[in-house]
């Protein structure tokens, strides 16, 4: 076995199997585990998926939302143990792989049409 095959086999054990199908433009709610003292709690983060990168264990999504008039983006490693759950709330209809143009828009211009042909 080559080194790459060994690495892939080890990474395959770490991949999460309960992830939903996530597409660009979807509105998702990501449950992030946060440690406070010796306790853990799950903090939800809701927004629009504007980018997906990499694959396998390094796969990430960038989620954008507007909080108190300021755009906030977070990058989540999909297979990280800090991600408790991901729920797709809405499917978006877009024609781009990266929605970075939303950064320059404000108000109603940031809305994305809903897509009904894919199930949640």
Curated annotation (Swiss-Prot):
Question: What Gene3D superfamilies does the record point to?
Answer: 2.30.30.790
The record's listing under PROSITE patterns reads: RIBOSOMAL_L19
- Which Cys-Cys disulphide bridges does the record give? none
- Lineage, top-rank taxon, reads Bacteria
| GO cellular component term, pick one | cytosolic large ribosomal subunit
Q: Print the keywords alphabetically.
A: Ribonucleoprotein, Ribosomal protein
**GO biological processes:** translation
What Pfam families does the record point to? Ribosomal_L19
The GO terms this record gives for MF are: structural constituent of ribosome
Q: What InterPro entries does UniProt report for this protein, alphabetically?
A: Ribosomal_bL19, Ribosomal_bL19_CS, Ribosomal_bL19_sf, Translation_prot_SH3-like_sf
What does the UniProt record say this protein does?
This protein is located at the 30S-50S ribosomal subunit interface and may play a role in the structure and function of the aminoacyl-tRNA binding site.
Q: Which PANTHER family match?
A: LARGE RIBOSOMAL SUBUNIT PROTEIN BL19M, RIBOSOMAL PROTEIN L19
Family according to the record: Belongs to the bacterial ribosomal protein bL19 family.
Q: What is this protein called?
A: Large ribosomal subunit protein bL19
In the UniProt record, what gene is named as encoding this protein?
rplS
